[in-house]
Amino acid sequence: MSDWKEYSLGDISRNISRRFDFNAYPNVVFINTGDVLNNKFLHCEISNVKDLPGQAKKAIKKGDILYSEIRPGNGRYLFVDNDLDNYVVSTKFMVIEPNANIVLPEFLFLLLISNETTEYFKMIAESRSGTFPQITFDSVSSLSLNIPDKETQQKILDIITPLDDKIELNTQINQTLEQIAQALFKSWFVDFDPVRAKAQALSDGMSLEQAELAAMQAISGKTPEELTALSQTQPDRYAELAETAKAFPCEMVEVDGVEVDGVEVPRGWEMKALSDLGQIICGKTPSKSNKEFYGDDVPFIKIPDMHNQVFITQTTDNLSVVGANYQSKKYIPAKSICVSCIATVGLVSMTSKPSHTNQQINSIIPDDEQSCEFLYLSLKQPSMTKYLKDLASGGTATLNLNTSTFSKIEIITPSKEIIYIFQKKVVSIFEKTLSNSIENKRLTEIRDLLLPRLLNGEI
């Protein structure tokens, strides 16, 4: 490291406060500290300027580093890799502008999100008096950083960036896979396309055979001519499609109930409480004062672990076997469905292995494992997310959906036959999603192993 030089953070960057020009953009995207996590935007919603809070003041540009002043160990940071002219960010962010003559912006970002720097920021934050741990740029500007020449910086980036790119590609693939599963779920269980196609055909005076053909069209998206060709070229697939269409009812009926007055559902389908579909478990946090309860054995899921995750494969905290067994009734198996119910309400994920959660999460252990995907997608519907938040509001500042209320939430439930058919169609999507998530965990571990050695000049 003889050619590496020591700088303070203040030597190679500054905390910039560019005033956002609201006259240029009547509609903006406001980014608060809770809207980013581990270099990803969680929310990017357009807002009218008149609806913005007072802390919406800072403009950003490509190459900036956003880093939350509040609780710096929580991963609320982001590298701005595009021009985002209509984005305004909270004053609770440090907007760090690197000195490009000394350090590449991407390289400084790697330094700032390293475990060593994060621990330093946490120490500074916790040493300051206040309602919650907080840093300012001035309080951390003396942080000592070893910086190589820019050519070496680029070589390090060339090693780390492909890992990040592969992780991002897997993430995008998973998002696409989930959209495919969501589209099928919506067609079958929200819009009831196969049932409505049958009902309309019968209403038009067609035979039951013709009605089932109409349902086959709705399910497959094929024309009658294409279905005829399918029956000849792929008879097994055609027969499977016919059996699927046959499983759907022919009629829509009104369901009376507090939450669904006047709503039509397929005949024979029922409104069932979540507690009728599985065991409901509210998590619990073992005592932090007992160090034996924490280790590397059992995932301990908290709400930040759930963001944008179909399957939870990585957690910031883990329990020891001792800690997990101390509250053994809180164990949830693989393919349990976790729902965030306090503060950030409505996140839904599935476990990838036996786990525990904290008390902000209610989980469903499905009675029938083949219903996992159906239950997951039911709880992921936008209308359900809104309903969960409405139930949790209760007139208090902090959203809180208790376990009793959560257990009584009802969802439209078809016959087991249809649930099994649906599971068969989407299970490969979920298996591929899990595989990608596990690969991302492995790539992250490789990255985290390499990064400190690269940043210390050991490689």
From Swiss-Prot:
SUPFAM superfamilies in alphabetical order: DNA methylase specificity domain
GO molecular function, one term: DNA binding
UniProt KW keywords: DNA-binding, Repeat, Restriction system
Cross-referenced InterPro entries: Restrct_endonuc_typeI_TRD, Restrct_endonuc_typeI_TRD_sf, Type-I_RS_S_subunit
Gene3D superfamilies, A to Z: DNA methylase specificity domains (3.90.220.20)
GO biological process terms, semicolon-separated: DNA restriction-modification system
Job of this protein: The specificity (S) subunit of a type I restriction enzyme; this subunit dictates DNA sequence specificity. The M and S subunits together form a methyltransferase (MTase) that methylates adenosines in the sequence 5'-RAACN(5)TAG-3'. Methylation protects against cleavage by HindI. In the presence of the R subunit the complex can also act as an endonuclease, binding to the same target sequence but cutting the DNA some distance from this site. Whether the DNA is cut or modified depends on the methylation state of the target sequence. When the target site is unmodified, the DNA is cut.
Note: Type I restriction and modification enzymes are complex, multifunctional systems which require ATP, S-adenosyl methionine and Mg(2+) as cofactors and, in addition to their endonucleolytic and methylase activities, are potent DNA-dependent ATPases.
Family statement drawn from the similarity comment of this UniProt entry: Belongs to the type-I restriction system S methylase family.
Binding partners and assembly: The type I restriction/modification system is composed of three polypeptides R, M and S; the restriction enzyme has stoichiometry R(2)M(2)S(1) while the methyltransferase is M(2)S(1).
Protein name as annotated: Type I restriction enzyme HindI specificity subunit
Lineage: Bacteria, Pseudomonadati, Pseudomonadota, Gammaproteobacteria, Pasteurellales
Gene that encodes it: hsdS
